[in-house]
Design a protein with these regions (language model features):
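Peripheral terminal and linker regions in Fe-S/redox and tRNA-modifying enzymes
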Residues: 2-295
Length: 295
C-alpha cells in the first residue's frame, strides 16, 4: 500500500536565519528579541564598509547604506556613532552583558549613552569595529537596523506598560508587532524625514504621545456586544522648529485585526509621496503636512 500523500517535504534549512543559506526569518518569542536579525545584512555591511575604506566606494554612496544600519559618521576621520534600538525600552540581562562586552572591546571611551528615545549609542567607534559590534549584538537579538536615516526610528513606550494598574490592557505586544511590520518595509526606507513613534499604556500618557509623529493610546469599545481593543491615533506632533501637539486623527482604530497597522501604513504612504517636503529638510516632517492639509 502506498504511503505517498502527494506532498513534498521541504528540505531543512542550514545556517542562521537571514543568512544566504537560510533566507527565512522566523520570529523568536524571546524577551528583548523584537526586530528580526538578518545575517546577510552584517555580511553586506562588511562588504560595503570594506569598499569604502579601500576607496572603492564614494562617501555619498556609502552614507545611505550606513545610516540604515544605525551607523552615523562623526566629524573625526574613521569614527562612527552606533545607535542600537531598544524597542519600547526593553532589554534583557543577556543583552546588558553584551553591551558591556562590546563597549569594553570596541568603544574607545569605554562607555555608552542611554538616549531619551530608548536607544543605546556608542561613540568614536572605528568603522571596521562598528561592523563587528553590530554583528555581535545581533547574536543576542539586538538590532541597529533603521536606528538612523529617514525611516521609522526606535519605537518608544511607557516603561510601566504591562504592570501598571491604570492600563486597559497591555499595549506591548501591539507595539512589538508595529516594530516588526515597519522595519525594512519598502515604504519606510527613504521618506522625506524620520518617523518617531510612541505607544503609551494609559491616559496618564507616560510615553508623551503629543510630541510624536505618530502615537497610540489604548482604548476599548463595545462592538456588537464584544469588548474590542483599539487605540486612539495621534499624528503630527513634534518639538524643535514649529512645536506641535499631535492632534487625534482617529478616535478608535482596532488592534487585533491589524487595522492600526494598515492605517499607519496609509499615513506613511501619504507622507512619502509629498516630494515638496523633501526640498527643505528642516520642515520635512509629518507635522508640516498635517498643518497644511489638516487632521
Amino acid at each position: 500500500m502506498s504511503t505517498d500523500t502527494g506532498t513534498t517535504e521541504s528540505k531543512p534549512r542550514h545556517g542562521r536565519p537571514g543568512s544566504l543559506e537560510n533566507p527565512e526569518v522566523a520570529y523568536e518569542n524571546v524577551p528583548g528579541h523584537v526586530i528580526p536579525i538578518l545575517e546577510r545584512e552584517f555580511d553586506d555591511f562588511d562588504t560595503e564598509a570594506g569598499k569604502f575604506l579601500h576607496g572603492d566606494l564614494r562617501e555619498d554612496e556609502f552614507i545611505g547604506f550606513r545610516l540604515k544600519q544605525g551607523v552615523y559618521g562623526q566629524r573625526q576621520a574613521d569614527r562612527q556613532m552606533v545607535r542600537v534600538k531598544l524597542p519600547m525600552g526593553g532589554i534583557n540581562p543577556e543583552q546588558v552583558e553584551a553591551f558591556a562586552d562590546v563597549i569594553e572591546r570596541y568603544v574607545p571611551l569605554k562607555k555608552g549613552h542611554i538616549t531619551t528615545r530608548q536607544n543605546i549609542q556608542m561613540h568614536h567607534v572605528p568603522l571596521d569595529d562598528a561592523a563587528k559590534l553590530i554583528r555581535e549584538l545581533g547574536d543576542t537579538g539586538l538590532s541597529s537596523r533603521e536606528g538612523c536615516g529617514n525611516t521609522v526610528r526606535n519605537v518608544t513606550g511607557d516603561p510601566w506598560a504591562g504592570v501598571c494598574d491604570d492600563e486597559l490592557f497591555d499595549i506591548t505586544p501591539y507595539a512589538a508587532a508595529y516594530v516588526r511590520y515597519f522595519v525594512r518595509h519598502p515604504t519606510t526606507q527613504l521618506m522625506p524625514r524620520k518617523i518617531k513613534t510612541a505607544f503609551t499604556a494609559s491616559d496618564a500618557d507616560r510615553a508623551i504621545t503629543g510630541i510624536h509623529d505618530i502615537a497610540f493610546i489604548p482604548r476599548v469599545r463595545e462592538i456588537d456586544g464584544e469588548q474590542v481593543r483599539g487605540v486612539e491615533l495621534r499624528v503630527g506632533g513634534g518639538t524643535s522648529i514649529m512645536p506641535r501637539v499631535a492632534p487625534t486623527i482617529r478616535d478608535f482604530v482596532t488592534l487585533d485585526d491589524g487595522e492600526y497597522l494598515k492605517v499607519s501604513e496609509a499615513v506613511f504612504r501619504i507622507f512619502d509621496r509629498q516630494d515638496w517636503l523633501r526640498k527643505n529638510r528642516a520642515r520635512a516632517r509629518i507635522k508640516v503636512l498635517v498643518d497644511k492639509i489638516g487632521a
